[in-house]
């Protein structure tokens, strides 16, 4: 299974573009900051993650303000020929 849920804000956003198939696409950088329990101890977790939205989700996300908190749902995939670089593919998002 490859399903990811992440609370994050959009820190950076590229221009809305189109894939070779003609679908809208939006490249973004997400920032996450939380406190979680790990091995019985509280741990602060910060992460910055490359992400992409395709289709109607890309159009919706492009119209949202930078810095707003969202709950993102999607999957992780390698970035083209460089499979060691992970990109979060956003399939849906809602207000966190």
Which residue ranges define each predicted feature?
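Single-stranded nucleic acid-binding surfaces, predominantly the OB-fold ssDNA-binding core
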Residues: 1-96
């Amino acid at each position: 299974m490859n399903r990811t849920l992440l609370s994050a804000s959009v820190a950076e956003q590229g221009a809305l573009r189109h894939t070779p198939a003609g679908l809208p696409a939006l490249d973004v950088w997400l920032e996450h900051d939380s406190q979680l329990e790990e091995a019985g101890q509280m741990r602060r977790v910060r992460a910055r993650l490359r992400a992409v939205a395709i289709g109607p989700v890309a159009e919706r996300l492009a119209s949202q303000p930078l810095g707003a908190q969202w709950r993102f749902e999607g999957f992780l995939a390698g970035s083209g020929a460089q499979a060691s670089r992970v990109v979060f593919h956003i399939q849906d998002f809602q207000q966190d």
